[in-house]
Structures are given as structure tokens and as C-alpha cells.
Amino acid sequence: MIPLSVLDLSPVAEGSDAGQALRNSLDLARLAERLGYTRYWMAEHHNMPGIASAATAVALAHIAAGTARIRIGAGGIMLPNHAPLLIAEQFGTLAALHPGRIDLGLGRAPGSDQVTARAMRRNLHAEIDDFPQDVMELMGYFRPVVPGQAVQAVPGGGLDVPIWKIGRAHV
């Protein structure tokens, strides 16, 4: 059987609200689990009134708590928007609560306009070229903690959180 996954943006239907959109996402994840889907992904989008998945790790916690077997992942977290340590702590927490079920997809674009990026308080002068170093830093936080390690993700160190590089191709 070909493994199938769901990518959900948690759309807010006209006349509805974000809370209902997130409840609908949980219903969709439960259906995907019952149908034997392999993974359920949510994507990070900011400042978009029609999408409720901006706080992706929080939304994934809701989905993971309401399902039992399906893998849950970010498809993806836009790495330029976040410090690698914070991502490691968030997804380390998810992995500690739901062992063997958490995936982390990373994107290299900010995925938002400059006004929104500024509101997220990230360095607007950071280069996309920082992506490889940020990925390596993030992966380091998931390695087993070594004596004398100055900074650790707790939870995070030594946990199995597969990291995926997301992207798109132009045809």
C-alpha cells in the first residue's frame, strides 16, 4: 500500500472562527487515522485570517492528544521565523508526550511579508544562507546531551524527531 498523508492548513470557513477550524482539523486527523493514513501535517502561516495553524506546535499538540497512532508533523515550520532552540524545545516536548509520532518539516522561506516578519521579532537582515547553519544547530539540540553542554533543549536532547526539508519545485 502506498503511504498517504494529509496536509492541513486548518482553514477558517466563512462565518466560522479559528477555534472551530482547529476542532475541524482534529476531526480530519481522526478520520485520516481511521482510514490508515501515515502522517498528518500542519503548515505555519501568519497574518492570514482564513488559516488557523499559525501556532503550529500548539495546534499539533491538540491533534496529537486527540489521536493515537498517526504520525503528526509540521509541514512546515519556517526556520527564518524562529530560533532553533525554541523549535527544538517545542518539538522535543511534543516528542516526549507522543513518542515515535512527531515529525518536523522545515522551510527556508519566511512565508510572510516584511511587516509580519517584523511583528515576529526576528532579524529581518538574516540571510536565507543561514538556513544550513540553523538546521545544524537545531539538529544538535536533538542529539544526546553531553557533559558541559552550554545550551540544551529540555526536553529535546536524545529524542527522535525526524527532520524533513520541505520545498517546492518549479516545473
Per-region residue spans from a language model:
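Glycine-enriched alpha-helix->loop->beta-strand junction motifs that scaffold or abut catalytic
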Residues: 66-69, 98-100
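Glycine-rich "substrate-gating" loop/helix at the edge of Rossmann-like oxidoreductase active sites
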Residues: 49-53, 77-82
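N-terminal amphipathic alpha-helix/helix-capping segment at the start of soluble metabolic enzymes
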Residues: 1-5, 150-160
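N-terminal beta1-alpha1-beta2 module of alpha/beta enzyme domains
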Residues: 1-67
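Flexible, glycine-rich active-site loops centered on histidine and acidic residues
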Residues: 3, 7-18, 80-143
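Hydrophobic faces of well-ordered beta-strands that scaffold small-molecule active sites
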Residues: 4-8, 40-42, 72-75, 102-106, ...
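Generic structural signal for well-ordered alpha-helices
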Residues: 25-30, 57-61, 88-92, 132-139, ...
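Conserved small/polar residues in nucleotide/adenosyl-binding loops
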Residues: 169-171
